[in-house]
Amino acid sequence: RLAAVGEQRDAQRTVQLAEGSIVNLNAFSRVDIRIDDAQRDIKLPRGEATFKVSPDPARPFRVRTPGAVVEAVGTQFNVYARPDGTTSVTVLEGKVKVTSDHGGSALPVPLAAGEEAQVLANGRIEREAHTDVAEAVVWQQRKLIFKRTSLEDMAAEFNRYNKKTRIRLEGI
């Protein structure tokens, strides 16, 4: 089965997949879902989603962004395919493996609950232990938190959520 979900600027959606997993999709995000007897494959070409994965060791659950592949069996994690080509992965419960999808023979990086990794546009994976997982999913409460973020990136993130009020930077 193949299905596409998402693309609305100001709407978050929760989707329960036929095999029991739950996808919380952020605003202006899209997932393409392919589930069959051999695989559970989710493409996240743009945006952000939290996945609560039903255990099924025979069919690993894979989320593919333009720059990374995240694999889980039964866990909960957040993935954000950023506009700059970086993919952020935060593990809320359980464990996942993160692999760069930029070619080469990069080994998977294991992450456990409370850990985060950034897969950079050049394929390098930067791992951060003991992250604040609540901040990774604050978008589900329709809130934004910025740390070490340029004003331009903050405006772009705000505009992703809001179609009535837009921020435009001039002369900066």
Describe the predicted segments one by one.
Residues R1-I172:
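A residue-level detector for the "anchor" residue at the start of short, highly conserved motifs
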